[in-house]
Amino acid sequence: MSDYEPLRLHVPEPTGRPGCKTDFSYLHLSPAGEVRKPPVDVEPAETSDLAYSLVRVLDDDGHAVGPWNPQLSNEQLLRGMRAMLKTRLFDARMLTAQRQKKLSFYMQCLGEEAIATAHTLALRDGDMCFPTYRQQGILITREYPLVDMICQLLSNEADPLKGRQLPIMYSSKEAGFFSISGNLATQFIQAVGWGMASAIKGDTRIASAWIGDGATAESDFHTALTFAHVYRAPVILNVVNNQWAISTFQAIAGGEGTTFANRGVGCGIASLRVDGNDFLAVYAASEWAAERARRNLGPSLIEWVTYRAGPHSTSDDPSKYRPADDWTNFPLGDPIARLKRHMIGLGIWSEEQHEATHKALEAEVLAAQKQAESHGTLIDGRVPSAASMFEDVYAELPEHLRRQRQELGV
């Protein structure tokens, strides 16, 4: 007889399912203000404790506490609030438009607004972002025209991308927003390469890339970490741990019993684990990582702990795999509500101002939608010309493509 039990595999399970309340104790939260802030020139190995703790600034009463408090000005706080509100309202309006069959597809960032907006405010003009489909807040924070965003969603005759990208896969070189890819984890290797190119040219611009918790299981994630470490690429690598990769719990990607931030430390990269629903913590950690990159101190990996409050996309029904009230029970709360409480406590915001701003931004989004629809909708056939498929690739069109264009008569 064998002295050993039969071998068996471990399959991680979520701590909550429909009809069974989620136990969020697996998150291992740190009290606000208690996590140390190292100097920007810290050795990566000395950030190992920061990869397991949780950087937080806002306490339960809305006070900013601890060494990570970025001491933002009133103007910065107001800009951040407006950017988060506009992002959420834009999402809500586009979700409604999809349900009305005005759009074919949409993806929200509900509950994750602070990650894109605060991070963007901590960057500089010229820094290049390599986003996923939940970082529309970058464009909104950088005041990219809402009309152009909606025209892209509609793929109409005014679509800046001429109908060549799926809805929500925006792109704008001028806004420092690299083309979104539907393939997972491509953002990391692209950003590392861009950052290396910036260094080779002797530039001062840095790169910042985003992926989700599920995409850390892709090989590109590990390849990017290797190159970033070896060449000390000026890049920020953001892992948005929103607990779910479509219907797959984050533990399946390797988050059980450890953190995604810890993978950076193992690769020789300075790493942080941060409350992604704390606007001030997001700004502070982003500013710290950006300073490291800009001072040639190497890359940083940041795990943003948050919660995907909405469905994965308009094709998803999360009620099939998680409790309906999960977001309301998530211990890190709503990023907008938390910043609002802080600003009211400072005396620079009020419920009345919040409501008035909400209405004004809602009207702005609606006006942008109407203007975008004037350039064409899904049903009226006003789309980019067929001739546009021959543009924007070759400086001089090859003979075989000239023949094809002639045959099409465009």
Curated annotation (Swiss-Prot):
GO molecular function terms noted in the UniProt entry: 3-methyl-2-oxobutanoate dehydrogenase (2-methylpropanoyl-transferring) activity
The reaction(s) this protein catalyses: N(6)-[(R)-lipoyl]-L-lysyl-[protein] + 3-methyl-2-oxobutanoate + H(+) = N(6)-[(R)-S(8)-2-methylpropanoyldihydrolipoyl]-L-lysyl-[protein] + CO2
Pfam family, one: E1_dh
Enzyme class: oxidoreductase
Matching SUPFAM superfamilies: Thiamin diphosphate-binding fold (THDP-binding)
Gene Ontology biological-process entries: branched-chain amino acid catabolic process
UniProtKB keywords: Oxidoreductase, Thiamine pyrophosphate
This enzyme's EC code(s): 1.2.4.4
Gene3D superfamilies: 3.40.50.970
InterPro entries given in the database record: Alpha-ketoacid_DH_E1_comp, DH_E1, Oxoisoval_DH_suAlpha_N_dom, THDP-binding
Signal peptide limits: none
Cofactor(s) named in the record: thiamine diphosphate
Keyword Lyase among record annotations: no
Function: The branched-chain alpha-keto dehydrogenase complex catalyzes the overall conversion of alpha-keto acids to acyl-CoA and CO(2). It contains multiple copies of three enzymatic components: branched-chain alpha-keto acid decarboxylase (E1), lipoamide acyltransferase (E2) and lipoamide dehydrogenase (E3).
Sequence similarity: Belongs to the BCKDHA family.
Subunit structure: Heterodimer of an alpha and a beta chain.
Protein name: 2-oxoisovalerate dehydrogenase subunit alpha
